[in-house]
Amino acid sequence: MPIDAAPITDLRALARQWPRTGRLEAIVLRPARGQAAVEVATTEAIAGRGLQGDRTGDKARTSPLGGKRQVTLLQAEHLPLIAAFAGTAQPAATQLRRNLVVSGLNLLAARSPFADQTVHLHLGDEVVLELTGPCDPCSKMEALLGPGGYNAMRGHGGLTARVLRSGRLRVGDAVWACVAAEPAPQTTDQAG
């Protein structure tokens, strides 16, 4: 016998609701390729570029929107899962080299399932990001997490984003998602 349930009448309305606000748990900067990542308490997000002090944010951009991988984000709740799948201790945020670690807000749900409904991620009082895609793990995860480390991170490697509005980021900032008032600008950037 089927369970009575209210029908879903407006999936778009459901996709606009989040149960709670998240929190920025860590800010990680990667000064240069091959250099150790560093955790900081605050940094500046620069529209169309990335984070000040990070190798992607310090690069000059030719497109006004910049590339699609200006900032990388990781779900804090995925850290213990990655460790469990790899059979290792929980890795530090700096080891995984993702710029922003967020807890309490499902980052995957902050990507709209509808092409004509853009969702923006707000961090603190100023910064606005647009999530642009998955941040797949690289082969360095094998060395970090051991054999199978790459596969331990698959599906949990985080997301990439572009900075739409500049501002100061601080560990502890509130993070929330909302549907944009108008669609985000489109780009034909191929470097992304």
Segments from the language model and where they lie:
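Metal-cofactor-dependent catalytic cores
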Residues: 1-192
